């Protein structure tokens, strides 16, 4: 999915609001995903999956930090996330559908915290961006 100049501006704009909340939004995203899609928990058997756990906060922060990094390098998402793509495809072997589920949960978290900023246009741009990230993360599965 190609991101237009307007999409890129919308994504960068919403991520300025997200940047200071990586741990909080990341943890909320993971908790929402684990609750809504319980099979996603199978990749985290060693984690304390209870609300507010340090492991959920820590991993959530990593997830959102990677999204922030991708937004900061929006013209080279593939290069920016290349190592993560390798990790998820070859070592962790995460089912590719989980990236879409994570993206949906992240959109909900952004909507909860920034309802006025998540206009229909920004929502569409952020969705396209998250799809692009998912495509990059699953590219090495082939």
From Swiss-Prot:
Which range is the signal sequence, renumbered to this chain? none
The cross-references to InterPro entries, in alphabetical order and at most eight, read: Globin, Globin-like_sf, Globin/Proto, Hemoglobin_a-typ, Hemoglobin_oxygen_transport, Hemoglobin_pi
Q: Which GO terms describe its molecular function?
A: heme binding; iron ion binding; oxygen binding; oxygen carrier activity
> Which segments constitute the Globin domain?
2-142
> Mind telling me which PROSITE patterns this protein's record contains?
GLOBIN
A GO CC term assigned to this protein in UniProt:
haptoglobin-hemoglobin complex
| Top-level lineage group | Eukaryota
Name any Gene Ontology BP term: hydrogen peroxide catabolic process
| Binding, heme b | 88
Tissue note: Red blood cells.
Q: Does the keyword Transit peptide apply?
A: no
Record key words, sorted: Heme, Iron, Metal-binding, Oxygen transport, Transport
Show the Gene3D superfamilies listed in the entry: Globins
Detail which positions bind O2: 59
* Job of this protein: Involved in oxygen transport from the lung to the various peripheral tissues.
The family annotation for this protein states: Belongs to the globin family.
- Which miscellaneous remark does the UniProt record hold? This alpha chain is from the adult major tetrameric component, which has been called hemoglobin A or AII.
Tell me, how does this one assemble? Answer: Heterotetramer of two alpha chains and two beta chains.
Q: What is this protein's name?
A: Hemoglobin subunit alpha-A
In its UniProt entry, the species of origin is given as Gallus gallus
The UniProt gene name for this protein comes to: HBAA
